[in-house]
Amino acid sequence: MAKIVQLPDDLSNKIAAGEVVERPASVVKELVENAIDANSSVIEIDVEEAGLASIKVLDDGEGMDAEDCRTAFLRHATSKIKDENDLFRVRTLGFRGEALPSIASVSHLSIKTSTGEGAGTHLTLQGGRIISEQKAPSRRGTEITVTNLFFNTPARLKYMKTIHTELGNITDVVNRIALAHPEVSIRLRHQGKTLLQTNGNGDVRHVLAAIYGTAVAKKMLPLEARSLDFEVKGYIALPEITRASRNYMSSVVNGRYIKNFPLVKAIHEGYHTLLPIGRHPITFIEINMDPLLVDVNVHPSKLEVRLSKETELHELIRDAIKDVFKQQQLIPSVQVPKKTAPLINKPEQQKLDFDQVREPAPLSDSDVEREYKPEPSFSAMKLSSLVKDPPPSAPVEREENVMQDTEPEWPGAEEYTPEAAPAVQAEPEQAGENVQDEETPKERVPIMYPIGQMHGTYILAQNENGLYIIDQHAAQERIKYEYFREKVGEVESEVQDLLVPLTFHYSKNEALTIDQHLDDLAKVGVFLESFGAGSYIVRCHPTWFPKGEETTIIEDIIQQVLDDRTIDIKKLREEAAIMMSCKGSIKANHHLRDDEITALLDELRRTSDPFTCPHGRPIIIHYSTYEMEKMFKRVM
């Protein structure tokens, strides 16, 4: 008797559902993508109990006739591809013909659909089997209702998370689809409460406002770049607006939301040292390319894709982001708190003019608390020989009735916990407001006249635009980082011979790795010579190694090689420069002379990125004259 048998269709569909339908969010994703493929302009999604009780998706798309409706629930039945050549030219979101039969096999499903010509079709299925077929109204479009999800797969139901978590997953999926298709009006409701409403006018900024709040959307900069193979566009948040999770970084390829680590890496490299360690930006990157350059047939969920010419795309995105920030003045301006106006309803957000001036969200007391709170002690400077006090500028008339944004910001897939978007302590000014196109990098930071030092840590300076507070350690870190970044690698002509060679010892396994990368280590100034089993000596080092730190620096660089196992010379030089700049910079509670402060500010202005230290912390904070006068009630 034969041992190998062909599985029945209902069992095959359940197996396929294990990959396609992982949770209620998977059902929502597949149904909404089908609606978009049907050229819908309006999609309404209603879920009960985070989709475990019911999911209903209603669209105004092309609909289906009775025959197509029945065929759609057969395995691998689709209208989107005809032959294997179409697999390499996929322009639709779906094409595998697995979603509907997989969903139907693990639920009770009802579908009403019509092409708008004649009566429609109403099918009812249980566990993938059609149990009734009736006529339906001729309204053009499709309505699918899924209930009792996973009723016949209790093991899958057992591993569902809490209602909040599953709803968070659904919200995350719908948010990303809405970003990828701003031309479609999408409404998501849970238990009758609207969670997302987009107007479908094609402007992705309005979708960003609906998802992240208007204050965040107004602080996002447009991004555009082209090459022979790729067209990249989207919006990237100013560096001050960060999150602890990567879930706020959305990438879309040919209208399909994807997860791709190399793209995330390219975005981080574009921000470079503008981001604090462990923080991630809010970004939306849309990439259009020839379908031949992307393989979407990698996984049934179609979230993972393979990209051709990935290195070229990586460089295009990274350089485009860098170019955007090179044109911006990124000095954060602290704003005076003001009374919070009533909340704006989500649908009204779609009507906001993005060119209007807005005040940032108000600061709470906790936002401005400092860990270091001694009695004020200022070291005053005699400035009469340097510069006269700038004349007080007339306060600029500002719109006082601008509504503050306190809209909730929907989280990513980890947990659904709606809460007000946190106020950013130091919101930068709207991009491009104070920056002229013809400015050089030196003019990105204005000339500042020092007036003192606070706690031996912060430099106070002024000009006609107000007060500036400079973190002296972060400022010198940036200066030294850019110096060392240029010096690392220029080692051949600038070396210091040692009277007594430095000796280093490693295990046999570590020595094998080091031996493979001796040439790479030499390129960053570490000249190792074998000195027995697992031992090495260094007879010279670059003259720019910080004095007294030579042994530590060499050990740290070698450890980077041992940790990574593979060498990226550019990355190694970068890490070495960051390490040396941090070790050699002035620390807190270090009082500087007047001439030292002036020299430090002049050197900072000459750096290419004078706004953050190499670790992403801000260097300069700005209080405008208007805000100072407002705090002292000189203006109301």
Swiss-Prot record:
Residues 341-420 are annotated as: Disordered. GO terms for biological process: mismatch repair. GO terms for cellular component: mismatch repair complex. The keyword DNA damage applies. Residues 348-358 have a biased composition (Basic and acidic residues). Keywords: DNA damage, DNA repair. CDD domains: HATPase_MutL-MLH-PMS-like (cd16926), MutL_Trans (cd00782). InterPro entries: DNA_mismatch_repair_CS, DNA_mismatch_repair_MutL, DNA_mismatch_S5_2-like, HATPase_C_sf, MutL/Mlh/PMS, MutL/Mlh/Pms-like, MutL_C, MutL_C_dimsub. The keyword Disulfide bond does not apply. GO terms for molecular function: ATP binding; ATP hydrolysis activity; ATP-dependent DNA damage sensor activity; mismatched DNA binding. Belongs to the DNA mismatch repair MutL/HexB family. This protein is involved in the repair of mismatches in DNA. It is required for dam-dependent methyl-directed DNA mismatch repair. May act as a 'molecular matchmaker', a protein that promotes the formation of a stable complex between two or more DNA-binding proteins in an ATP-dependent manner without itself being part of a final effector complex. HAMAP family: DNA_mis_repair (MF_00149). This is DNA mismatch repair protein MutL.
